[in-house]
Amino acid sequence: MEDEAVLDRGASFLKHVCDEEEVEGHHTIYIGVHVPKSYRRRRRHKRKTGHKEKREKERISENYSDKSDVENADESSSSILKPLISPAAERIRFILGEEDDSPAPPQLFTELDELLAVDGQEMEWKETARWIKFEEKVEQGGERWSKPHVATLSLHSLFELRTCMEKGSIMLDREATSLPQLVEMIVDHQIETGLLKPDLKDKVTYTLLRKHRHQTKKSNLRSLADIGKTVSSASRMFTSPDNGSPAMTHRNLTSSSLNDISDKPEKDQLKNKFMKKLPRDAEASNVLVGEVDFLDTPFIAFVRLQQAVMLGALTEVPVPTRFLFILLGPKGKAKSYHEIGRAIATLMSDEVFHDIAYKAKDRHDLIAGIDEFLDEVIVLPPGEWDPAIRIEPPKSLPSSDKRKNMYSGGENVQMNGDTPHDGGHGGGGHADCEELQRTGRFCGGLIKDLKRKAPFFASDFYDALNIQSLSAILFIYLATVTNAITFGGLLGDATDNMQGVLESFLGTAVSGAIFCLFAGQPLTILSSTGPVLVFERLLFNFSKDHNFDYLEFRLWIGLWSAFLCLILVATDASFLVQYFTRFTEEGFSSLISFIFIYDAFKKMIKLADYYPINSDFKVGYNTFFSCACVPPDPVNISIANDTTPAPQELSAVSSTDMHQNATFDWAFLSKKECLRYGGKLVGNNCNFVPDVTLMSFILFLGTYTSSMALKKFKTSRYFPTTARKLISDFAIILSILIFCVIDALVGVDTPKLIVPSEFKPTSPNRGWFVPPFGGNPWWVYLAAAIPALLVTILIFMDQQITAVIVNRKEHKLKKGAGYHLDLFWVAILMVVCSFMALPWYVAATVISIAHIDSLKMETETSAPGEQPKFLGVREQRVTGTLVFILTGLSVFMAPILKFIPMPVLYGVFLYMGVASLNGVQFMDRLKLLLMPLKHQPDFIYLRHVPLRRVHLFTFLQVLCLALLWILKSTVAAIIFPVMILALVAVRKGMDYLFSQHDLSFLDDVIPEKDKKKKEDEKKKKKKKGSLDSDNDDSDCPYSEKVPSIKIPMDIMEQQPFLSESKPSDREKSSTFLERHTSC
């Protein structure tokens, strides 16, 4: 028996296969613990009052048997041991699985105070560490906090903590209003249960009520190295001549100790800036550990108050205390006490144990929580990891939900490798989206959208009351103005100024403002699009060739298209959006993003062509370059200095006078004046402006780089959190202002933003209203239905694909979508724009994504070291409405807007195009083509889909994108919407090329991080399902005698606290606590 290995009866059912993500985020425990090679069974000692406990032991022993292990489909190894459900898991499942209507337990702030000496005389409780999510220690020297780091615990300290919970006082849901009352309650309980001698009451009370010195106070704190030099001054004080009698002891206790305790927070607590890291409803958990020389056995107590109470200066921050853990022990074990204190503090910061601590009914519940924590512990070999190395907090924390779901019940969802993991919808889709369910009633979807959005209408206005909304308004306004000017200019060229820049401004303002006020998804931004521009050009040329009235013909096309869109609304046709999977969405959004990037560089190249760089220019040959202004007609030019007008007189000189004045010096005119008066520029240096192009590219690339850098400034290490967040929110506006100032200081005449200054139609041949009859034959009104069908497809596809992208699950929108309501208002606005001869507007993908990115919300308070959590998007109607109102008022702001260089706005275009590609799986898969296998990220689809299949899917997507780009660049661009619709057919065809299993990972609308979370939950549920099936054959209830963690727990078997029996060999190697409990 001495050579036999210890049998771990709990290992088989807790077999855990760690994936890379779990290992990466859970390296939190180090230590190797000596486990005895021999096993000697404990002798069962009889107790006079332990009949019930004895019967329980015997029943458990009888029911404790080996069972066969249930193998998973993906596990090749088998175990000879039969699984037994973990008693800790069973009890935790009962605790966390209870239905409780009470709110979730609040966030805990845990503080570790240790009993240290001041100048070798007085003892004080000094703060040495604190926790919210991660551990922060007082650095050596005691003048600053360490950086937050993952708490690394010794496994031995966890065993000792478990023993503390077994043998110490557990007081749950007690009531106290002050620290002295609470201390007295604890000490009396220890005396009543025989754990403390009555003559030690005053000494323990005196010790527990000593001052608390926090790190915020500017005092002479010692380093952590002095923790081991704790003091036995309490004993000296009690044995001094002044404290010889109990009466004198009591008087000293009152005067020296209780006067140091206040029920109200101190000024240092109220001024502590660390409160910003805590939510408003946070509570405190205080851990007090120390060594004294008047105790022979450890004094251990764990207290949970019925209601959290402010206990004066006990805690660093002014938050009420809910939990109190006390450990006072004999001298010589300061290091062990310190590690036990860190262990309980770390457990209190663990989300699962945190919930158990709040819901525990007795001691066994708490012990089960510790066992569950030990089940999840990762042990690092002591020779392969230095515990002094502080582990940086991970960027993304592993979700505790998968641990909680294992115990809280729920469906046992199993994933079949031959079927899609999302439920069998062939690659995701939106079948589970309530907004896209077909009602089968006339306008049923529209009515449901109205009912869904009506309750939020008021909140859509007051939810915008945040400084973040201002930055979004300015950013999107400048993007919208630039877009309106660009498309307005192109539209004017395509339609002979029948629609121009001013019409673009007015149409954008009217359509956008009405849409944002009444549509189902006000975060969507309307704008003109490339396909609409192509259609307008073709329609104008067609009307011109056949002598049709262009505006009237366009009016009837718009009316027919609006009518068809309303039919689609009435028949709930938006349910077809559920067939737009990731393949279609990413193809469309990536194409639009690439168009933005391409157009930004195209405009800069065009600018460089207009202001060329003269590469032949040489500094030493300045005389070779010249440029002169000559009159348009050959006249006898004689230089007469006395007749040459002064510069200030040029404005009074007319073109006719200049032609008639033969003695006028044309060479005196500037370039603009020469061209204005009909002159000609002659010379090889007339178009040479060397600085404009270079300066424009500096502004262009500088704006883009600055926008990207300032947007990421939120995660930098500089400045306080509030300042970083403010800079990040206003990143685009700051970049624009910075480079506008640089442009003004340098003084180079770069091209500026030109806004119409008069409110009138661009063409004098049109008005603000288009009559519907009289310009074309009657049959044209009916024939307009044919091109209107194409426009309807264009509008429907652009609008709904953008709406799907805006309403993605990862945006965490809470007020719901409104696909039918959005399309309804697009149709109504099309009628208005058709009658006013304004451009048609539809949802703009890139600007809408930029709008959402500028309104993303994160947690206001996050624990030190913890990344802010994304909460969702600030859903409201104010930002979009004000953006379009300002766009309409831009005509009156022309004197201000003219100072903005166009290269700066092109840089904003480039930023929007690149930023909208972030988080797109298509781009991630493109990068995989350039990565060696060992450097590829841990994407969920790479775990389940062969790499060659991933590359094949990416190749097909690139091919479709290339075809769409080629189509867009030709005259056939008018059928661009039809080709977008063809992407759906291409995706359906992939069902014959890829298995549903592969498509479910490659073409799923579920975000990557949520998909990992789902998979981990399914693994846990599958594991829980096997445990449930085993539990049907076992009626073994929970007992602390049964091992419940992955490693042998025989050394932790409970023994009578005041046992008088002779300890066995195993007991001799037990913890320090067991060595002091035989008094």
From Swiss-Prot:
Localization of this protein: Basolateral cell membrane; Cell membrane
Tissue-level expression reads: Expressed in colonic mucosa, kidney cortex and to gastric mucosa.
Kindly state which keywords UniProt assigns to this record, in alphabetical order: Cell membrane, Glycoprotein, Ion transport, Membrane, Phosphoprotein, Sodium, Sodium transport, Symport, Transmembrane, Transmembrane helix, Transport
| Region Interaction with CA4, residue ranges | 748-779
Q: Where is the composition biased (Basic residues)?
A: 39-52
Query: Residue ranges of region Required for basolateral targeting?
Result: 1057-1059
Ranges annotated as biased composition (Polar residues): 251-260
Phosphothreonine: which positions carry it? 49, 249, 254
- Show the GO MF annotations: monoatomic anion transmembrane transporter activity; sodium:bicarbonate symporter activity; solute:inorganic anion antiporter activity
Protein's UniProt name: Electrogenic sodium bicarbonate cotransporter 1
Species the sequence originates in: Oryctolagus cuniculus
